[in-house]
């Protein structure tokens, strides 16, 4: 699979004064080197910056381009990877203000509310702006090639067909690393309060495209609306998340009850995977992280049996025989078992 890879600097809104750095690794057509609809979009939210350690492992696993390539290796070559940094930092502390309005000056959330759906709306806007930026740097002759572009999806103007290796209705995998887990909590909250939508029982995304585009059948490289995003989420990965305050894991039972109800009403199946290391789960100075994780796991497991097998929950503990360290906190990304 041909790919376009790079690190983008894009605003969330056209008139925004702040920018997000986003590492991207995207599927390209081997024939035309134009963007393809992927089997899935894997969206990875980074945490605080860790600088000046002199540790080559931490530095390598803090590099957005490296991270995007690792994410592709975990989910497969037909996956687009998006590695998102916060737009604002207070020293080393990531502040995802546009995604979680309740955060303080250090990026720590006081609560998670669905009002306005800020995380899903911001994610859709950011990915759309990223695509526009990528399209602007693709070579012009290769970018157009007598094709019609629908947010980067190439459609033959004579046959109306997409390339044979494009996929219909891409799935979305959401990953939150360290403080990036707070963005996951906000997205999960919004998911619980969202409508199922028209694509809940859509054909499997693995089905190869071979049909004409007509109105509602248009497909997109990334979700076009917050509803499209939320309804496309099939996996949620908490990757060694933690905060210096409460709120590292979501412990609102009502949210998980609502998600379970969505699944019973026809939403596509959903997997939660909690990945951790001794760095976070065995930290005695921040014992609330382990307590919140255990509570969230119990809540998820209590709801899973109600969905007829559509709600799956997994817990994976890494480096259990090693003492806690900052290096293992980053190494979990490379060791991640996403199966």
Predicted segment positions?
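Conserved beta-strand elements of beta-rich interaction domains across eukaryotes
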Residues: 47-51, 87-90, 179-180, 242-244, ...
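Short, surface-exposed "cap/lid" segments of acyl-processing enzymes
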Residues: 7-103
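Serine-dependent carboxylesterase/thioesterase catalytic core
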Residues: 138-269, 279-282
């Amino acid at each position: 699979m041909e790919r376009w890879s790079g690190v983008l600097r894009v605003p969330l809104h056209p008139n925004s004064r702040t920018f997000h750095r986003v590492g991207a690794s995207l599927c390209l057509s081997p024939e035309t080197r134009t963007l393809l609809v992927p089997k899935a979009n894997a969206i990875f939210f980074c945490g605080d910056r860790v600088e000046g350690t002199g540790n080559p492992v931490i530095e390598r696993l803090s590099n957005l381009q490296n991270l995007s390539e690792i994410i592709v290796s975990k989910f497969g070559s037909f996956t687009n990877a998006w590695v998102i940094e916060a737009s604002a930092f207070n020293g080393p502390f990531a502040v995802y203000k546009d995604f979680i309005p309740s955060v303080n000056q250090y990026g720590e959330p006081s609560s998670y509310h669905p009002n306005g759906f800020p995380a899903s709306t911001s994610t859709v806007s950011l990915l759309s702006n990223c695509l526009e930026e990528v399209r602007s740097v693709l070579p012009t002759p290769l970018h157009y090639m007598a094709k019609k572009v629908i947010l980067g999806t190439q459609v033959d103007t004579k046959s109306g067909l997409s390339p044979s290796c494009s996929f219909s209705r891409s799935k979305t995998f959401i990953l939150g690393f360290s403080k990036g887990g707070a963005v996951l909590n906000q997205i999960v909250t919004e998911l619980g309060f969202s409508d199922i939508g028209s694509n809940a029982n859509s054909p499997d995304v693995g089905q190869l495209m071979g049909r004409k585009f007509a109105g509602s059948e248009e497909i997109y490289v990334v979700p076009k609306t917050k509803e499209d995003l939320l309804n496309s989420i099939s996996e949620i990965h908490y990757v060694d998340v933690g905060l210096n305050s409460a709120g590292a894991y979501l412990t609102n039972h009502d949210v998980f009850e609502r998600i379970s109800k969505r699944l019973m009403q026809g939403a596509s199946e959903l997997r939660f995977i909690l990945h951790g290391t001794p760095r976070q789960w065995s930290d005695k100075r921040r014992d609330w992280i382990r307590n919140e994780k255990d509570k969230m796991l119990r809540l998820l497991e209590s709801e899973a049996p109600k969905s007829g097998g559509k709600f799956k929950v997994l817990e994976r503990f890494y480096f259990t025989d090693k003492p806690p360290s900052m290096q293992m906190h980053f190494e979990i990304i490379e060791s991640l078992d996403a199966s």
